[in-house]
Amino acid sequence: LSKSVGVITVTVPDDSLVDQHPEFTAGTEVTLDESNTEIFVRSRDTETSQSAIARLGRQKIYIRAFVDKAKELYAEDAGYAAKLYQALTPYMVTNISQDRLVKLVQSIDQDKGYEEWTIPGEGIQGKEYDEYVVDDDALYEKTVETFYVEKK
């Protein structure tokens, strides 16, 4: 994925990686390339409860930066979306066609974008593993808000 856009610059959101990777200090602007992108998006301290939540935050930051960079590349070359699809094909299983991906990239380029949200709940320490307990009432409300339109 990182090869398809080149380097991406992000701001490190927290110190969750700093013990193993001092370059990832909270507030530091870092350039992600093939040598460090995987560390940024996949690493977590499995000895620290709820470290997966911090990792998810870094993944969201990476995806936003990736989309911004892809939009720039698409603005320079309308064929970029097709090139991206071809570059990703060996690493993915999808029913999204190349034409559909091109349309998705075009909609992002037109600032139609998307709304990002997290399933409401809280992380707790279980007997053996971290657990995420969903707030069922809040999830129901968010589901109705997101997927249903009131008849008038």
Where are these regions (language model features)?
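Second-shell loop/turn segments in exported
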Residues: 45-54, 70-75, 87-94, 126-137
